[in-house]
């Protein structure tokens, strides 16, 4: 009988031990999960504040007035469009490398080119040079339809996946040479080019709707933002801002050599 009693006592102790262990594990798990959620929420709040500071101090104060552009820049999480190692620098007003000898444009230039294109909720936009996908995301926050061409297949795939994951459904990306635009989807109310040829491609002007604007950096070492507006009688062209973009490759480079 004593032996049976001892066995029962041992079993009860083991059962209590298992119950206590399960309780401690569940409590620790909840605490860890809660800590991770809290850390994630704090990081999200931090990124929102960084975007607000970027817009107010680097963009609005430099003369960007279009509230749709400012709201789009506050909304798009730029840190997701740069390498993880550079995420803490994402909201500096600087271009950053994204691999493949390409860069993401500085926030002010993105805002400037977007505002210059004069977008509305009904605008259909073509972007030449998807790159990281950041400019395309800003455009998609404002315009009704965005089409973007990237000459590097790896970047096109990476950007498409990221933008899909972020929920952009009014944006279409394809891999190809953007020098001749996207004639199947023309005309466009605005065309933004994020790589610099040494001349304005004629095909892009032809794909503008009347009243539409082409915003493009033009030049080799010395580049300027060039704005071409299509009118009933032809086009008007102005140069506005000195910039430094990566050169446009593909057919643009071949034609540069031929000139």
What are these regions (language model features)?
Residues 1-12:
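N-terminal secretory signal peptides that target proteins for export/translocation
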């Amino acid at each position: 009988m004593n032996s049976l009693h001892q066995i029962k006592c041992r079993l009860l102790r083991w059962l209590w031990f298992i119950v206590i262990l399960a309780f401690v594990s569940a409590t620790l798990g909840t605490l860890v999960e809660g800590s991770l959620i809290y850390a994630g929420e704090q990081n999200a709040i931090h990124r929102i504040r960084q975007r607000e500071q970027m817009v107010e101090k680097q963009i609005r104060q430099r003369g960007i007035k279009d509230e749709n552009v400012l709201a789009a820049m506050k909304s798009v999480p730029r840190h997701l469009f740069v390498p993880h190692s550079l995420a803490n620098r994402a909201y500096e007003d600087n271009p950053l490398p994204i691999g493949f000898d390409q860069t993401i444009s500085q926030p002010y230039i993105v805002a400037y080119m977007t505002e210059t294109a004069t977008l509305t909720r009904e605008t259909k936009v073509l972007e030449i040079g998807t790159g990281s996908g950041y400019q395309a995301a800003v455009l998609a926050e404002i315009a009704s339809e965005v089409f973007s061409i990237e000459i590097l297949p790896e970047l096109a795939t990476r950007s498409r996946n990221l933008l899909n994951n972020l929920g952009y459904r009014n944006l279409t990306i394809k891999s190809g040479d953007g020098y001749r635009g996207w004639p199947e989807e023309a005309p466009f109310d605005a065309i933004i080019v994020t790589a610099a040829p040494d001349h304005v491609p004629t095909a892009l002007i032809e794909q503008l709707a009347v009243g539409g604007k082409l915003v493009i950096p033009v030049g080799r070492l010395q580049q300027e933002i060039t704005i071409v507006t299509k009118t009933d009688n032809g086009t008007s062209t102005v140069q506005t801002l000195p910039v430094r973009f990566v050169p446009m490759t593909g057919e643009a480079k071949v034609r540069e050599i031929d000139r």
